[in-house]
UniProtKB/Swiss-Prot annotation:
It comes from the Eukaryota. Residues 51-65 have a biased composition (Basic residues). Expressed in skeletal muscle and heart with barely detectable levels in liver. The modification Phosphoserine is found at residues 16, 33, 66. This is Protein phosphatase 1 regulatory subunit 3E. The lineage of its organism: Eukaryota, Metazoa, Chordata, Craniata, Vertebrata. Residues 28-86 are annotated as: Disordered. The gene is PPP1R3E. Residues 176-198 are annotated as: Glycogen-binding motif. Keywords: Carbohydrate metabolism, Glycogen metabolism, Phosphoprotein. The keyword Phosphoprotein applies. It comes from Homo sapiens (Human). Acts as a glycogen-targeting subunit for PP1. PP1 is involved in glycogen metabolism and contributes to the activation of glycogen synthase leading to an increase in glycogen synthesis. The CBM21 domain is known to be involved in the localization to glycogen and is characteristic of some regulatory subunit of phosphatase complexes.
Length: 279
């Protein structure tokens, strides 16, 4: 029993071959400029097997291309500058921007009104006041000291060989003087002081300021110290070295204490502030 050969116009029922033909027809309609390989109609004997081999064998030198999304021509690539940066913006519920950028020049410092600075410093002192060590004798600290006007000053000077004459705290620092008994021509007088309750200390030399009124026979030395800290006290003691001996005046072991201003701007003459609004 013989089987008849199908006519040449009969398309074999092969799904892969049909899919290949459909894909070629789609790309030909979308990309007319693409070159298609010439197809030769196979002979009578190689119709079925030649079509199958072309459907399964991959074409050489060709790459698969995806169809354009819009169905139109090729889209031109978007040019992007290397300096282009992406920006991200944040907005609140009303659509307003949450971030505000302000640019400052290094040479131009922002101008802050003086009353704002005073308020900020006052708040900082109130916040950190419990953390600061309380200087010894802070309750007894005063803005000015004048031991020379007290009774018994001459007797105390003879006993100690050195005594504080006067000291006063101002906005620019402390100015004071001391008297020392004239025991020799060469003598050295200095002031040891501290602004943090003697956790740290420094020593400042005193300069000869001439003879002091008798009695007893004595010389006067003047000194200058930094201003007391705000809300605190400056502690100091006097030191006298002469002929290999050393004498001290530390207010009977309590140290001398000068009180600073309670808050910034409390000392000195008030400064005008109206012109700040016109900067």
């Amino acid at each position: 029993m013989s089987r008849e050969r199908p006519p040449g116009t009969d398309i074999p029922r092969n799904l892969s071959f049909i899919a290949a033909l459909t894909e070629r027809a789609y790309y030909r309609s979308q990309r007319p400029s693409l070159e298609e390989e010439p197809e030769e109609e196979p002979g009578e004997g190689g119709t079925r097997f030649g079509a199958r081999s072309r459907a399964h064998a991959p074409s050489r030198g060709r790459r698969a291309r995806s169809a354009p999304a819009g169905g139109g021509g090729a889209r031109a690539p978007r040019s992007r500058s290397p300096d282009t940066r992406k920006r991200v913006r944040f907005a609140d519920a009303l659509g307003l921007e949450l971030a505000v950028v302000r640019r400052f020049r290094p040479g131009e410092l922002p101008r802050v009104p003086r009353h704002v600075q005073i308020q900020l410093q006052r708040d900082a002192l109130r916040h950190f006041a419990p953390c600061q060590p309380r200087a010894r004798g802070l309750q007894e600290a005063r803005a000015a000291l004048e031991p020379a006007s007290e009774p018994g000053f001459a007797a105390r000077l003879l006993t100690q060989r050195i005594c504080l004459e006067r000291a006063e705290a101002g906005p620019l620092g402390v100015a004071g003087s001391a008297r020392v008994v004239d025991l020799a021509y060469e003598k050295r007088v200095s002031v040891r002081w501290s602004a943090d309750g003697w956790r740290s200390q420094r020593e400042a030399p005193a300069a000869y300021a001439g003879p002091a009124p008798p009695p007893p026979r004595a010389d006067r030395f003047a000194f200058r110290l930094p201003a007391p800290p705000i809300g605190g006290a400056l502690l100091f003691a006097l030191r006298y070295r002469v002929t290999g001996h050393e004498f001290w005046d530390n207010n009977g072991g309590r140290d001398y204490a000068l009180r600073g201003p309670e808050h910034p701007g409390s000392g000195g003459a008030p400064e005008p502030q109206g012109w700040i609004h016109f900067i």
